[in-house]
């Protein structure tokens, strides 16, 4: 892997870490209410969590919360944490403590992206999923995001090798074919309810892969934006976060993004839509803001 690839991804993840500890508290309150009767609680390395450098929180179909960190994998059952780290005898199959992202496939298996591989949990052991480039040669690369698509495939976002896919019964992960194959440095993706794939490049440009495979590079309202994150609510509205120009909204059925005036020009890193459809906004050096799309009210560090 080229050093530039690793540096770009690490820089992006370090920005995320500046507020992710606070975000854990809110996500636990919002996604695990059935497991936690008490008020929100902040977890950190002094209180059960294996590291303060956390990159993703994921709730599986059984309600368990999985937390990816730079020092192992954490599993929370509503009462206690279990920490899984790389073992010297490789008994658990975890080949790195540097875990970036988590999702779950259609069979209920946990899928992890690390700094050098893709792993899948088979029973009680993680197994490596071979990653093959466009020439079908095996690679080891930095996985920045894993996401389950509507057709059941797992989309694997990498830094340097573009988007790859793992089919549900496949034993390997392959480069996504079509026009998107030419994209290499990708920051984040989102598949919307129409099965279109929104792609944020590491340079902040937003693209869209249509269901027929065609790649759209001109998206109205985003021409000059440095985009950071993208989410869709349960009504089909798409929120687009930018680096220094606030949040833009693509209403369901619309063709152009428009700026949400009430949010202003916040320096945004990540956004998250809660179950009650509020927008949680993580900002670089400014903590968390919460935007209510019904009232238009923006709350600072609730």
Q: Can you annotate each of these PLM segments?
A:
Residues 1-302:
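Carboxylate-rich, polar loop motifs that coordinate divalent cations or form catalytic acidic clusters
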């Amino acid at each position: 892997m080229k050093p530039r690839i690793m540096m770009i991804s690490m820089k992006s993840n370090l920005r995320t870490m500046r507020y992710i500890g606070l975000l854990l508290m809110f996500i636990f309150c919002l996604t695990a209410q059935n497991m936690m009767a008490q008020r929100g609680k902040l977890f950190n390395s002094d209180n059960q969590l294996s590291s303060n450098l956390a990159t993703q929180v994921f709730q599986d179909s059984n309600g368990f919360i999985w937390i990816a960190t730079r020092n192992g994998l954490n599993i929370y059952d509503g009462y206690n944490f279990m920490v899984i780290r790389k073992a010297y005898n490789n008994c658990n199959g975890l080949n790195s403590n540097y875990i970036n992202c988590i999702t779950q496939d259609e069979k209920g298996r946990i899928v992890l992206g690390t700094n050098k591989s893709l792993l899948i949990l088979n029973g009680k052991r993680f197994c490596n999923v071979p990653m093959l480039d466009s020439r079908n040669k095996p690679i080891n690369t930095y996985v920045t995001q894993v996401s389950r698509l509507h057709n059941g495939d797992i989309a694997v976002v990498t830094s340097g090798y573009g988007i790859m896919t793992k089919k549900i019964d496949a034993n390997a992960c392959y480069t996504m074919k079509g026009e998107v194959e030419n994209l290499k440095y990708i920051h984040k993706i989102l598949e919307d309810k129409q099965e279109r794939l929104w792609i944020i490049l590491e340079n902040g440009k937003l693209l869209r892969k249509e269901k027929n495979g065609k790649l759209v590079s001109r998206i109205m309202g985003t021409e000059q934006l440095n985009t950071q994150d993208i989410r869709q609510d349960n009504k089909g509205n798409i929120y687009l976060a930018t680096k220094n120009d606030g949040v833009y909204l693509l209403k369901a059925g619309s063709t152009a993004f428009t700026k949400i005036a009430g949010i202003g020009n916040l320096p945004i890193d990540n956004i998250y839509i809660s179950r009650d459809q509020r927008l949680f906004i993580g900002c670089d050096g400014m903590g968390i803001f919460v935007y209510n799309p019904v009232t238009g009210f923006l709350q600072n560090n609730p």
